[in-house]
From Swiss-Prot:
GO cellular component, one term: plasma membrane
Protein source organism: Legionella pneumophila subsp. pneumophila (strain Philadelphia 1 / ATCC 33152 / DSM 7513)
Function: Produces ATP from ADP in the presence of a proton gradient across the membrane. The alpha chain is a regulatory subunit.
Subunit description: F-type ATPases have 2 components, CF(1) - the catalytic core - and CF(0) - the membrane proton channel. CF(1) has five subunits: alpha(3), beta(3), gamma(1), delta(1), epsilon(1). CF(0) has three main subunits: a(1), b(2) and c(9-12). The alpha and beta chains form an alternating ring which encloses part of the gamma chain. CF(1) is attached to CF(0) by a central stalk formed by the gamma and epsilon chains, while a peripheral stalk is formed by the delta and b chains.
Record-linked InterPro entries: ATP_synth_asu-like_sf, ATP_synth_asu_C, ATP_synth_asu_C_sf, ATP_synth_F1_a_nt-bd_dom, ATP_synth_F1_asu, ATPase_a/bsu_AS, ATPase_F1/V1/A1_a/bsu_N_sf, ATPase_F1/V1/A1_a/bsu_nucl-bd
Coiled coil: none
Keywords: ATP synthesis, ATP-binding, Cell inner membrane, Cell membrane, CF(1), Hydrogen ion transport, Ion transport, Membrane, Nucleotide-binding, Translocase, Transport
Name this polypeptide is given: ATP synthase subunit alpha 1
Catalytic activity field: ATP + H2O + 4 H(+)(in) = ADP + phosphate + 5 H(+)(out)
Single GO MF descriptor: ATP binding
Similarity-based family: Belongs to the ATPase alpha/beta chains family.
Site positions (Required for activity): S364
Compartment annotation: Cell inner membrane
């Protein structure tokens, strides 16, 4: 063996020393000044950044940087602990919050940090999604051009929603906003739409009943539930919608369709106001901080329809907001109305009169959903919303004893028939084929001679026949007309 070209041991060490570069590892350490109400004030940490994660020495405390001053760092607690006190060392992790994402979260109930609340295993961490990230730029977006079927007669026909749209559900407490949202989730079964239901500031009983309803409808198979209860730390209430958005965003970027429901953003706005006041930020209108509009806009702008070049995925957002005595002109509702692509308004007087869902057509609008509506549905619904609004005006005159001619009386009768048709029980989503069937039946006058009490029976008959029929949205109208006539005559 030739050893002449083999470097000696000393030569190897010399080469290693030449390559060696001395690096000083610098780590920051701060100390707790005060702690209380879910807020930590920390001295030190000159390199701290907004949204950065902080931990204590024994890792019993996890917090997030939320406010910076010249002397102190304000952080929000994300884990409840009694071990934290003044003088406790705090260390930055030099990274921002992320959450596990992916198909393995389907059927799970988690908190905004990704911890399981259903007694199951900890979700795998192979795929992570940032809680807060920039929304897709304009060039990465596409027009809303595909319908999201809700299973609701009023929405699918008069206030249609498209995939990638942001539609606000607004109204007083207890009028059925959450029930409608659950209806929409239940209707996505077998439609390849992944759902995320975010419960923000809800009571434990409400959380339990919501999860139970999803289980009974077999909707948990394609749904992830993110929960921040009313008793949770304000920091978790603040993070909950961002966690749900990150989970849904993962499916959108994979070219799939996702639906995320924020129930509700009133509690989210209140938690943000609480944190801001505790951190001594200057209050603005209704004591909310000045950037509350930016907070909700950067959350909702992440919901969109991506261009085909990026997979064509979509994320539809249905934020829920609560009003007081039907007042829409308050700060947070007006903010969200201006951010979203339309709103569905729930009216207390309609609810009291037994008209369910208590959706006020006069104040509800879908600005982009009409472009995504199926041509057959769009053609049949046509002027229906306008005709219904005219009927409401005419009916108002009859209450004052005004005399109407035969044409107007016929229009009022037809409007009352339509109002009876649009009534729908909770948690009973209907297939889109049924929607087309009743539209054709209504336009052909098949309901005109019926008593209002008989209309639900006829609708039930159509619903039963639809389940056994081979007709689809693409079938010729004459086939639909002939089949419906036979069903109603039988």
């Amino acid at each position: 063996m030739n050893w002449s070209n083999t470097p000696s041991f000393l030569e190897k060490q010399r080469q290693r020393l030449e390559r060696y570069q001395f690096q000083i590892k610098v780590s920051e350490q701060g100390r707790v000044v005060s702690v209380g109400d879910g807020i930590i004030w920390i001295k030190g940490l000159p390199g701290a950044a907004i949204d950065e994660i902080l931990i204590s020495e024994d890792e019993c405390c996890i917090a997030m940087v939320f406010h910076l001053t010249e002397e102190l760092v304000g952080a929000v607690m994300l884990v409840q602990t009694k071990k934290l006190k003044a003088g406790t060392p705090i260390f930055p992790l030099k990274r921002v919050l992320s959450i596990p994402v992916g198909d393995k979260l389907l059927g799970r109930v988690i908190d905004p940090l990704g911890h399981p609340l259903d007694g199951g295993e900890i979700p795998p961490h192979e795929e992570q999604g940032l809680l807060d990230r920039l929304s897709p730029p304009i060039l990465h977006r596409d027009f809303v051009n595909r319908p999201l079927y809700t299973g609701n007669k009023m929405l699918d026909n008069l206030i249609p929603i498209g995939k990638g749209q942001r539609e606000l559900l607004i109204g007083d407490n207890g009028l059925g906003k959450s029930a409608l949202a659950l209806d929409i989730v239940m209707n996505q079964k077998d439609k390849k739409v992944y759902c995320v239901y975010v419960l923000i500031g809800q009571k434990r009983s409400t959380v339990s009943s919501t999860i139970q309803l999803l289980k009974e409808a077999n909707a948990l198979d394609y749904t992830t539930v993110v929960v921040a209860q009313a008793t949770a730390l304000p920091g978790l209430l603040y993070l909950a919608p961002f966690a749900g958005c990150a989970i849904a965003e993962h499916w959108m970027k994979k070219g799939l369709d996702a639906l995320v429901i924020y129930d509700d953003l009133s509690a989210h706005a209140n938690s943000y106001r609480e944190l801001s006041l505790l951190l001594r930020r200057p209050p603005g209108r209704e004591a909310f901080p000045a950037d509350i509009f930016y907070l909700h806009s950067r959350l909702l702008e992440r919901s969109t329809c991506l261009s085909p070049a990026l997979g064509g995925g979509s994320m539809t957002a249905l934020p829920i907001i609560e009003t007081k005595e039907g007042e829409m002109a308050t700060y947070i509702p007006t903010n969200l109305i201006s951010i979203t692509d339309g709103q569905i308004f729930f009216d207390e007087s309609l609810f009291s009169s037994g008209f369910l869902p208590a959706i006020d057509i006069t104040k509800s609008v879908s600005r982009v959903g009409g472009k995504a509506q199926h041509p057959q549905i769009k053609k049949e619904s046509g002027r229906m919303k306008l005709d219904y609004l005219q009927f409401l005006d005419l009916e108002l005159f009859t209450r004052f004893g005004a005399k109407l001619d035969a044409k107007m009386q016929k229009q009022i009768q037809k409007g009352r028939v339509l109002r009876e048709i649009l009534k729908q029980e909770r948690f009973s989503p209907l297939p889109i084929e049924f929607q087309l069937a009743w539209l054709i039946a209504y336009n052909e006058g098949f309901f005109d001679e019926l008593n209002l009490e008989d209309i639900p029976k006829m609708l039930k008959k159509i619903e039963e026949e639809i389940k056994q029929s081979t007709l689809s949205l693409g079938s010729p109208r004459e086939q639909w007309k002939k089949a419906i006539k036979e069903w109603l005559m039988a």
